[in-house]
Amino acid sequence: MKRHEAREKAIQTLFQIEVSKLEVDEAIEFALDGEESDPFYEQLVTGTLEHIEDIDALLVENLKNWRLDRLGNVERTILRMATFELLYVETIPENVTINEAVELAKSFGDEEAGKLVNGVLGNIIKED
C-alpha cells in the first residue's frame, strides 16, 4: 500500500470511528475491505487516536475564528491525522504531510476545505 493510499484509508477509518462510533477493529476491517493492512496506515490510525487530546488542544490553539466542533467531520479528521503525522512521524518532511493533507481535503471535501487545512497546518509548523 502506497503512503497516499494509506492516508486515504486512515482518514476513512478515523471518520468511521468518530461518525459511526465503530470500534477501532471494526473500522479498520471496514476501511481495508479485505486488503492487507500496512504499518504506516496502522501508525496513522492508532497514533492519531492515542494522541487525540493533545492534537485537539493544538488544533484549537491554531484555528482562527473557528471552534473544533464547528469544523466538518472530514476536515477535522484530516487535520487530526495530519497533525499527528507532523508531530510524531519524523521520517516525512512537513511539506509532504501538508501537501497530502490538502489534497485529501480537496478530494474528500472541496477547494475551501483544502485552504482551511493548509492554513491550520501552516500555523502549526510556524509554532514548531
UniProtKB/Swiss-Prot annotation:
Does the record's keyword annotation contain RNA-binding? yes
Q: Which GO terms describe its cellular component?
A: cytosol
For this chain, one GO molecular function annotation is: RNA binding
Q: Give the UniProt record's GO annotations in the biological process aspect.
A: DNA-templated transcription termination; transcription antitermination
Q: What are the entry keywords?
A: RNA-binding, Transcription, Transcription antitermination, Transcription regulation
Q: Known CDD domains for this protein?
A: Terminator_NusB
A Pfam family hit:
NusB
What the protein does?
Answer: Involved in transcription antitermination. Required for transcription of ribosomal RNA (rRNA) genes. Binds specifically to the boxA antiterminator sequence of the ribosomal RNA (rrn) operons.
Task: State the HAMAP family in the record.
Answer: NusB (MF_00073)
Q: Per the similarity annotation, which family is this?
A: Belongs to the NusB family.
PANTHER family associated with the record: ANTITERMINATION NUSB DOMAIN-CONTAINING PROTEIN (PTHR11078:SF3), N UTILIZATION SUBSTANCE PROTEIN B-RELATED (PTHR11078)
- What name appears for this protein in its UniProt entry? Transcription antitermination protein NusB
Q: Which organism is it from?
A: Exiguobacterium sp. (strain ATCC BAA-1283 / AT1b)
